[in-house]
């Protein structure tokens, strides 16, 4: 899996490409931990799933840990542009009920607001 991180103003975009399976979940989780370990942490993080082909249960766990890390840091957290198969996994697992998911990056950027500490 390929992970690219880009700062777009106050929003940090994490672009995922490939398969977020058991082997890739650890690398994704470590990237997110490094991101939130920065001082100061980013005000908002959006995970762009437009090129994410597959997510396993270990990947869902990594998303949950990322959302919790964002909450601890006082950062907004959202996902966008999930492929239909990936979105179905989020829907069936109930993750779409607990995470902010937007149809595209522009919509996510417009709706994400950093929570006040």
Predicted regions and their residues:
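A charged, well-structured terminal subsegment
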Residues: 100-117
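Amphipathic alpha-helical interaction surfaces in cytosolic regulatory modules
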Residues: 22-99
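General small-molecule cofactor/ligand-binding pocket signal
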Residues: 4-6, 80, 102
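Conserved catalytic submotifs in the C-terminal HATPase_c
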Residues: 8-9, 50, 82, 106
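Short beta-strand/loop segment at the start of cytosolic alpha/beta domains
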Residues: 1-15
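Glycine-centered tight turns that cap/initiate beta-strands
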Residues: 10, 95-98, 104
């Amino acid at each position: 899996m390929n992970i690219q991180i880009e700062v777009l103003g106050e929003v940090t975009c994490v672009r995922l490409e490939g398969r977020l399976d058991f082997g890739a979940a650890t690398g994704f989780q470590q990237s997110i931990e490094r991101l939130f370990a920065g001082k100061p942490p980013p005000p908002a993080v959006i995970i762009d799933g437009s090129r994410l082909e597959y997510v396993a249960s270990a990947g869902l766990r990594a998303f949950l840990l990322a959302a919790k890390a964002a909450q601890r840091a006082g950062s907004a957290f959202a996902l966008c542009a999930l492929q239909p198969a990936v979105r179905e996994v989020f829907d069936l697992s109930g993750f779409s009920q607990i995470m902010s998911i937007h149809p595209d990056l522009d919509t996510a950027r417009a709706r994400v607001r950093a929570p006040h500490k």
